């Protein structure tokens, strides 16, 4: 997918002086404008528009949607080489339905994967609808009961969580493989942090005296949210020794750069194998483990939300790994 940033430039320059200099009625103006825009769409390939769209998203969403778009091209639902004019002529609702109804003989996608691909396609058409002043239509999800595009697949998150013994063994093996990544794992665990939050934390957000680290989250619509996590003094001493007199990012490579997610995921997976964890240990497994443990300890959802940054108790419940039988009736007798 070729990088380019000329989509907005092309769309911003489609109006010549002719449109403004002539004494046109509003209807005539709209007709001229749409014709200019339509002709310009012939010269803009879809891959260029996709790159501009992806650059407007968060890093995590951009990575996910880039993979989705490439997957849609691989199975022939779209072609990134087609001009936007041709893309505008497609029936996007049919493509959306095709994503949900793709047979396993073509590609084996889970329902969750299909819904991510569908959400990606809708997002792309919404973006293009806006920048083309409505010429490219928006793919509309189906709300028919028997053929809904989106519906809840599960109540609980699919991510596994380690128990106490597994957690200890994992950290022990990780400390032997990479000391820095061992510190990162503990940072994630204590604060139930997303891996991006842990990797982006800077030294000015640490108060060693009070044993706290502040984490910034970017929520929807660019809203910032701060969580303050208290860490054991033993850990803070190890972290202080690791940081030394450095300023900037807390966790860095030997070359002074930020730690890559791919590298960290590889180290975690390796430690999980050595610790004989029965599932792949990813950074998100540590977050799920933390929330699960806080729930087991009896912490209220509101307290856990202050740690994780979740905006509702429903999101906390999704991490509850306890059995259905482990409920209030086991602790209290009313008869």
Curated annotation (Swiss-Prot):
Domain of life of the organism encoding this protein: Bacteria
Residue span, Tyr recombinase domain: 155-332
A single GO BP: establishment of integrated proviral latency
Active-site residues, Swiss-Prot/TrEMBL: 194, 219, 284, 287, 310, 319
Alphabetical list of CDD domains matching this protein: DNA_BRE_C
Pfam short name (any one): Phage_integrase
Sample GO molecular function, one term: DNA binding
Keyword DNA-binding carried by entry: yes
InterPro entries (alphabetical): CB (IPR044068), DNA_brk_join_enz (IPR011010), Integrase-like_cat_sf (IPR013762), Integrase_catalytic (IPR002104)
Residue span(s) of domain Core-binding (CB): 44-129
Keywords from the UniProt entry: DNA integration, DNA recombination, DNA-binding, Plasmid, Viral genome integration, Virus entry into host cell
DNA-binding as UniProt keyword: yes
Family: Belongs to the 'phage' integrase family.
Record protein name field: Virulence plasmid integrase pGP8-D
